[in-house]
Amino acid sequence: MAIEQALIDALGGYLNIVEVEPCTMRIRVQVKTQLAVDEAALRVDGVLAVVRSGDVVQIVCGANSDGIAAAMIASIQSVAHDTPVDALSQRAHA
């Protein structure tokens, strides 16, 4: 499994992700609920640290952060095109 898909799954899946934003050496992800986030599963190879605060999960991936964030956003956007319109209001927007 690609790192971006592992991170999406660990963040509670597509429906739990509100926003993905690359921030220098980390990926800032706003989630609907922290209860759906599996922090242990976020600690895959390539992840240096995980910081959780409020509805935000910051995933530190160093120099690879921008590329991983771009792959996560592309994956989320591709799902949006295959998701029924009524589900989009419940779905995350990246």
Mark where each language-model region is.
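Soluble N-terminal domains of membrane-associated systems
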Residues: 1-94
